[in-house]
Amino acid sequence: MPTSHGERSCTRYKLKKTVRERGLSPISKAIQDFEEGQMVHIDIDPSVQKGMPNAKFQGKTGKVLGKRGRAYLLQVTDGNSKKEVISLSQHLKPQKY
C-alpha cells in the first residue's frame, strides 16, 4: 500500500496526549491573548483540529506579528528561512523569561 501524504501523516507520537491530558483542554487556553511582538511556543493541542499549524512546527518558538480573525500570525524560523504560520491560541503557549 502506498504511503499517505495527508496533513497528519507521520504524527503518531507528535500529536498524542498523555493519559493525564486526555479529553478537552481548559477554556482558558482558548481565551488567552497575546500582544504583537510577544514570543510564543507552538504546542499543538490534538483535541482542537481548527487552526492547527503544520506538525513540523511543533515545539518551535515564534514571534506574534498580528491577528487574522481569531487566529494569530506568527513568524517562525525554519532553518535559515523565516516562515509565517497561522494558528489559534489553543496551540500556543507564552514564553516565560
UniProtKB/Swiss-Prot annotation:
It comes from the Archaea. Disulfide bonds: none annotated. InterPro entries: Ribosomal_eL21, Ribosomal_eL21_arc, Ribosomal_eL21_CS, Ribosomal_eL21_sf, Translation_prot_SH3-like_sf. Pfam families: Ribosomal_L21e. GO terms for biological process: translation. The keyword Transmembrane helix does not apply. One of its GO terms (cellular component) is ribonucleoprotein complex. The keyword Ribosomal protein applies. Belongs to the eukaryotic ribosomal protein eL21 family. This is Large ribosomal subunit protein eL21. The lineage of its organism: Archaea, Methanobacteriati, Methanobacteriota, Stenosarchaea group, Methanomicrobia.
